[in-house]
Amino acid sequence: MKYIALPNDKLLPELRKYDADGHVVLLSDKVYRLSFYLAMEEYVARHVNEEDCFFMWQVNPSVIFGRNQLIENEVNIDYCRENGISMFRRKSGGGCVYADMNNVMFSYITKEVNVGFTFNRYINMVAAVLRKLGVEAIPSGRNDIMIEGRKVSGNAFYLAQGKSIVHGTMLYDTDMRNMVGAITPSSEKLLSKGVESVRQHIALLKDYIDISIDEFLVFVMNHLCDGCIRLTDKDVKEIEEIEREYLTDEFVFGNNPRYMLVRKSRIDGVGDMEIRIEAKNNIIKKVNMLGDYFIVGDIDTGLLKRLIGVALKKENLEKALPDDLSEYVLNLKKEDFINILLG
C-alpha cells in the first residue's frame, strides 16, 4: 500500500527531525481545512492508479457529519461558532464526529468495491497495527475499533470514481469539552450502547501507549505502507478546486424543506434512520432519508424515487420497493424500512 504525501508533508522521511534521545519530532506543516482532505481522497481515487492508498491528517477543531444527516440534529451550531469549531459535511454515511490536532484522521482508498470486504480488511489492518503497539484493539460492529469495550476509532465508507473510500478517526487524544459541546448525539443512540457519558464511551490511545503522537504517525506509516507517492503543487491546486463543492452552504447545510410526517427509528446493524415525508391524501409527494446509516448504492433512484406517488399502505410499499434493500443501505431489510415508513 502506498502512502500519499503532500509536497511538504511532515511525515516524509527527509523532513523528519529527531531529538537528543532519538525520538522523532515532526516539524509543523501546513494545516488545511478538513474539506481539503476530503477532496484529496476524491483526487487520489480519480488520479492515482494504485491498488491501495493511505494517508493521515490532522485538522484544527472541526466537526464532520454524514451525507444524510440533518446538521441541526447532530451539531450544536451555536457552540461551534462561539468556540471557533468549523463544520463540514462529508459524502459518506455514518455519524457525526469531532476532530482536532490531538487526534488523527485516516483515509484509505482502494480499488476493491465490495463494502463488506473493504470495511473488514481495513479495520482489521488498523487494529493489527495497534496490537503491534501492545494495545488490545479489536474490530467491533460495522465500523468501529474498540479497546476494553470503548471506541478508539470509528469509520465511514463511500464509493467514488469506481473505488472505495474509507475514512475515520483515531483518538490519540482530544479536547473533551469541545467534543461533548460540539456534538449532540441522540439519547436513543447512547442508550443503545449502554453508556452514560461520552467519556465512558471512548478510549484515548495516549492512555495505552507510551509514544508521542508524532511517533505514532511514523509507526503507522511504516507498518501499513511499503512506499510513498508525493503529490505536487499542481495536484494541490486541483484538490482545492474539488474542495470548493464541500465549502458551499448548500452542501454543508443542505436543502431541508419542512415535511408533514417524520418517522424515526434505530435499526440494529443499520443505525439511526429518520424519514421525512410530504404526503397528500396519504400519497407520498416528497421523501427524504436522514441518519448515520451507510450507503452502498444509489438510494435516490433505488429507494426514494420509487416511493413518489405511492400510497402509505403496506401492500403498496411492498410492491414499489425492491426486495433487497441492502444493495442500497448496508444491512437494511425491506420489512424494517416499511415499518419505519408506516410509523
Where do the PLM segments sit?
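A generic structural motif
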Residues: T110-V115, K206-D210, G291-I295
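Active-site loop/lid in soluble adenylation, ligation, and acyl-transfer enzymes
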Residues: K2-I71, F157, I202-L217, M221-D272, ...
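Short beta-strand elements
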Residues: A156-F157, M170, M273-Y293
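Contiguous, small/hydrophobic- and glycine-enriched helical/loop subdomains that border
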Residues: N103-N143
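Active-site cofactor/substrate anionic-group-binding motifs, chiefly glycine-
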Residues: E72-C96
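Residues forming anionic-ligand binding surfaces in small-molecule and nucleic-acid pockets
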Residues: K91-T110, E188-K206
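Long, positively charged amphipathic alpha-helical accessory segments at protein N-termini or as interdomain linkers
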Residues: L133, S153, Q161-N255, I299-G343
